[in-house]
């Protein structure tokens, strides 16, 4: 088409997609995905930016092709991965016209649909189908909610560094980061966040080093190299990784066969910053002897509890830490007006093979059984042991990938806890908002509670997301993360951004 005579067709097999992507240089695909990821990112992933119309005239026969395209940036990983696996930098089209790349995305969507249809054949229950669909939606949600990234990053740094010091943690995060990466944690964040900021303007990763400023006496180039080496992957690494397309969420910087170090998607660079320190520490302990592997998971759970307690104190909520017994109970009992609220915190983070549109639903099911089933049992036990009449029972998940709407499907399984319509799943941002609402506007808080109960007992399709329920009732405020307790981390990120030439010139 046009001057680029490429073959497009229906994708009905892996071989079809292999033949298709071989027409393009891997470098050409990486250049095009980066360019389009910038456009979509700056638009806030708006529906207007995702919908395109392609009109292309075939130079050979004069035939005009009309094609509507829905850009799905979460599928860039699939196209890049398959391109690296099946092609290379030296064969195929390098400089793709915009319309050609959009048509390549259409073929990628066809391929994903083909693979999805095969996977769906393995789903044997409504619960399995729900897990598969919520896994699919979880990755998409991450792309569509840029603002949550900053909150998650700042909150997590506060828990790992400030709360760990305050409550004398056995984990010394500064030492672990230095040992694993060879740089101090602030320099790690400085480089990763700096690369993300610079990738909004340049594809070459090495461009970012010009805009980074370290403490006096530090070797800027050496620090930058250590961090980028840790988070980079060449084509052989990508091809041989058992992570598949998920490797770009772990190693987002791509070493091309033409000696470039490139950003493939602005989103990959953003995502790697968000939980970078957490994963360095977690992986450090996973490589320890078996009896030490759980150390960080357990300790992070304790620090997460302290974080929540600070939240309750800040908003003067009447709370009680539920006494521990031999049979495990929930963590917290809140009394807000005439409402009793039980909260069970879960700090587990889902494996990376779950966090994709073609989710490993068997692994997801296993994690749900391990996390949600256990939490439901703890909440029911606490309700009975403490003789609490009709409490609101909330499972607070640190990992916001577990969708609140999954809960009714859990009860559809053969599960001993009876669904009384008072169980909910929430993430930490939602609980911050929920607590603030209870403290500042009790009448609206009551309306939200009643709406929660109504939606949980009537299958009306409105959903059980606490965030959506609050927003639907006119509440959209989370002031807690703007508290001065987070200033050290907010200022660190602000300084990095403000030093970049683009923002300096504003």
For each feature predicted by the language model, list its residue ranges.
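Flexible loop/turn segments at secondary-structure boundaries
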Residues: 327-330, 349-352, 400-405
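Catalytic cores of nucleic-acid endonucleases
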Residues: 347-397
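N-terminal nucleotide-handling cores and adjacent loading/scaffold lobes of large enzymes
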Residues: 1-174
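Beta-rich nucleic-acid/ligand-interaction surfaces
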Residues: 321-335
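Structural motif
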Residues: 339-341, 392
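Conserved catalytic cores of phosphodiester-cleaving nucleases, focusing on short active-site segments
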Residues: 312, 332-334, 341-347
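Interfaces and regulatory segments of ATP-dependent nucleotide/adenylate/phosphodiester-chemistry enzymes
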Residues: 93-315, 408-506
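C-terminal catalytic or substrate-handling cores of phosphate/nucleotide-
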Residues: 382, 390-425
